[in-house]
Amino acid sequence: MADGGDALPVGLPPRGGPLGRSRGRLSASALTTYLRCPRQWLLLYQAGMQGPTRPSQILGVVLEEAFCELLMMHPPEEVEGVDGLRHWALPLIVSLASKAHLAGERAWEESLWNVEDEAWSDLSLETLIARLQAGLDLFLVEVKACFDADGGPYLSSMRQGEQPFEVPAPCQSAPPSFPLPDKVPDAALRRWPMSESPVWQPQGAPVKWNEAWECARPWFKDPRVHQPQRLYHPEGWASGELDLVLRWDGRIRIVDIKSGRPGSAFASSLEHQLRFYAWLWHETHDGQHASGMEGWYLDGAARVSYDVPDADEINRLSSQYAGIHQDMQTMVEGVLPFPVPPDLACDGLAAGCGWCSLSKDGNGEWNGSTFLSLVQDIPNVSLNSPYQPLSFIQGRVAVKGRLTGTWGPLPNHFGEPVLGAVLVVGEQHITIEESEPGAFPTLHSHHEQDVVLLDVLPGVWRDQPRLYLDERSSMIRDGENKLQPPDVQFTRLGLLRTRANVTGHVLSIGGRSGVRVDGKPWSMVSFILWDGASIAEVVAFGSSINQRLLDLRPGDEIRMTGVEIGWRSGVLQLRIDNRKTRIETASKS
């Protein structure tokens, strides 16, 4: 096998954590949002407070997948020149654009909250065809360069049927490469019918144009792979999912695909995004530096290049990103107040700002632009019994007992491997576990000892109370008074609050569905509940999703009894249990 280097564009979490997004990790999108507006990041990534879906958001997803499917195709041997490749690809582009347009229409119809002044039908099929053609033209620049370089350094090995990279570029004639193949029980998902295959010339023959396409094909996110295809920082606190990596000439060039134009409101974030990817590549590839980083814009076929960070800049970025990650973890926790005073809101000028610009002054006057009319039209909430304000929900507590029954790491209810144990007080016992992988690695250090647990988070799972430990929690041996804060108030296990009765109005709502790492489907609905003073994310999974939830829209009133109390990254998250939670709704109209 030819040596293509350790150019692996995907990896596994170092502590075995979730492959997908995690609120505890720094990602490129979280970073760029934070750099634009920290409060926008707080509400979007910590509170889950989103805006309505726009056609452009769906367009970016379906276009990227269609473009990647095009790159997977195998040109015929007889094709000649760049124009010949364009002619061969045109009917494929029309078919892929039609497929993408239908997929976008379905996604638009299934979205729970869409903008009112735009519609998916505003995007014509011709628009998608033109942008896929633009993507093709951007790639053909690489194909021509590869042809002019006699196929590049890997032509000989590829003609012999060898794969120069451990993670190959996806193509029609090869099966998909899963990050966790053992988690895919369906063997059919791991195979791929070879309906077509590349045609290679004998060794020593001049390179053909179809071979240049095959050699120049980059790695990209394989649309056949349902598992996240990410890079993970060795220390576990950062991850990123690259769009495309060019490797054909022995260099590493990182590319991000954009469906719009370079002059969009979010365009200024591209350089920060690519610098993060270049830094992450360096951190995950034994100090290897990328040779280039580019943005490919499909509206107009624009290629925007940036200078790659050098060694000194990489070191500065490491410190900067670690500091930002730390600031994110300590920015806020518990129940989030909303609205905030004007001095805590943003000015609303950064791309994506909406909820973060809303504020209310001491005279009760609202300030902001986006969503201002929505919140102003919502009436005050009547908090009569049995309902209580969100701010009354019990946060961190202190408990003590005997630590026993240690276990793990084993999967929690999110499928994340965590450490756990049992805390026993008299005849009562409760399960305690890490809030996420690596959050409290010393959990087992006081096995079979009497301990004091400080700043732990109460929750519930399958109708049984639990306690969660994170980086802010602490454990000391009972009796070590010098380590115990004075006047600490302990909570009896039987008095831990695991459910709440809440009421308020819906501010935002969204739904997601997909396939888990093991190939099983999942679905989720989440909305932001506002009681007039605070907000909380409310989530429902699988069988807990009913038509009443799917019919909710911003401004609707909702009353819930018996909703589960949970925490994600220390921020309140309420969870609907179809067996225990009772729901009443009233439409704003």
For the regions a language model picked out, list residue spans one by one.
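A non-catalytic, helix-rich entry segment at domain boundaries
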Residues: 66-223
